[in-house]
Amino acid sequence: MLLGVNIDHIATVRNARGTTYPSPVEAALVAETHGADLITMHLREDRRHIKDADVFAVKNAIRTRLNLEMALTEEMLENALKVMPEDVCIVPEKRQEITTEGGLDVLAQQDKIAEFTKILTDAGIRVSLFIDADDRQIQAARDVGAPVVELHTGAYADARSHAEQIRQFERIQNGAHFASDLGLVVNAGHGLTIHNVTPIAQILAIRELNIGHSLISQALFLGLPEAVRQMKEAMFRARLLP
């Protein structure tokens, strides 16, 4: 199982004081050195954390893959074609939200998503769609030509009871198997922590987890190398469980 380290909140800390540090590039390189299989960055329309220059700098510096999260807009499409990341994950975006609140509604935007997917694919960029674990959305993702889906784990991570968490886990598990049976590559992410990652990492249909906020939070106390190492170890151990 692969670990994508999202470094958005390195930029959040930097931007809080308008300094040049901490450096997203340095964070990306440290994460790579200590177990990250790819680096994820979300270039939001309001540039609240990652800036355009960060994306170019990280793409030029890293040795693994860059997974660029972006909204379904012409501006972001143009940026992606300039940066040429290995992967683009199309996500829903609202300016007033604190973080991404739900999955992309592929059914409601099939034509536009299909158009963006073809343009990016023709440029050699692999496209992923960040969606809820809903069979209709998963089928729509396949129909528009996306080879990858990233299942939104936020409802699982934020569940307020054990029963609700189990319900959300089963939804993700079923969605992952459905997507895999359709021939899609399945990733997952959002709200995952060292404390809740194990059940998700046990789902063999899921190939990659993208984790950011909790990793950066842990890094405040452990250091980024140890935070990445512990997460990767937790994922590895989960795969060994019966």
Swiss-Prot record:
<keyword id="KW-0664">Pyridoxine biosynthesis</keyword>
<dbReference type="InterPro" id="IPR004569">
    <property type="entry name" value="PyrdxlP_synth_PdxJ"/>
</dbReference>
<keyword id="KW-0808">Transferase</keyword>
<dbReference type="InterPro" id="IPR013785">
    <property type="entry name" value="Aldolase_TIM"/>
</dbReference>
<keyword id="KW-0963">Cytoplasm</keyword>
<feature type="binding site">
    <location>
        <position position="17"/>
    </location>
    <ligand>
        <name>3-amino-2-oxopropyl phosphate</name>
    </ligand>
</feature>
<feature type="binding site">
    <location>
        <position position="6"/>
    </location>
    <ligand>
        <name>3-amino-2-oxopropyl phosphate</name>
    </ligand>
</feature>
<dbReference type="GO" id="GO:0005829">
    <property type="term" value="C:cytosol"/>
</dbReference>
<feature type="binding site">
    <location>
        <position position="191"/>
    </location>
    <ligand>
        <name>3-amino-2-oxopropyl phosphate</name>
    </ligand>
</feature>
<feature type="binding site">
    <location>
        <begin position="8"/>
        <end position="9"/>
    </location>
    <ligand>
        <name>1-deoxy-D-xylulose 5-phosphate</name>
    </ligand>
</feature>
<comment type="subunit">
    <text>Homooctamer; tetramer of dimers.</text>
</comment>
<dbReference type="InterPro" id="IPR036130">
    <property type="entry name" value="Pyridoxine-5'_phos_synth"/>
</dbReference>
<feature type="active site" description="Proton acceptor">
    <location>
        <position position="42"/>
    </location>
</feature>
<protein>
    <recommendedName>
        <fullName>Pyridoxine 5'-phosphate synthase</fullName>
        <ecNumber>2.6.99.2</ecNumber>
    </recommendedName>
</protein>
<feature type="active site" description="Proton acceptor">
    <location>
        <position position="69"/>
    </location>
</feature>
<feature type="active site" description="Proton donor">
    <location>
        <position position="190"/>
    </location>
</feature>
<dbReference type="GO" id="GO:0033856">
    <property type="term" value="F:pyridoxine 5'-phosphate synthase activity"/>
</dbReference>
<feature type="site" description="Transition state stabilizer">
    <location>
        <position position="150"/>
    </location>
</feature>
<comment type="function">
    <text>Catalyzes the complicated ring closure reaction between the two acyclic compounds 1-deoxy-D-xylulose-5-phosphate (DXP) and 3-amino-2-oxopropyl phosphate (1-amino-acetone-3-phosphate or AAP) to form pyridoxine 5'-phosphate (PNP) and inorganic phosphate.</text>
</comment>
<comment type="pathway">
    <text>Cofactor biosynthesis; pyridoxine 5'-phosphate biosynthesis; pyridoxine 5'-phosphate from D-erythrose 4-phosphate: step 5/5.</text>
</comment>
<feature type="binding site">
    <location>
        <position position="44"/>
    </location>
    <ligand>
        <name>1-deoxy-D-xylulose 5-phosphate</name>
    </ligand>
</feature>
<feature type="binding site">
    <location>
        <begin position="212"/>
        <end position="213"/>
    </location>
    <ligand>
        <name>3-amino-2-oxopropyl phosphate</name>
    </ligand>
</feature>
<feature type="binding site">
    <location>
        <position position="49"/>
    </location>
    <ligand>
        <name>1-deoxy-D-xylulose 5-phosphate</name>
    </ligand>
</feature>
<dbReference type="Pfam" id="PF03740">
    <property type="entry name" value="PdxJ"/>
</dbReference>
<comment type="similarity">
    <text>Belongs to the PNP synthase family.</text>
</comment>
<feature type="binding site">
    <location>
        <position position="99"/>
    </location>
    <ligand>
        <name>1-deoxy-D-xylulose 5-phosphate</name>
    </ligand>
</feature>
<dbReference type="GO" id="GO:0008615">
    <property type="term" value="P:pyridoxine biosynthetic process"/>
</dbReference>
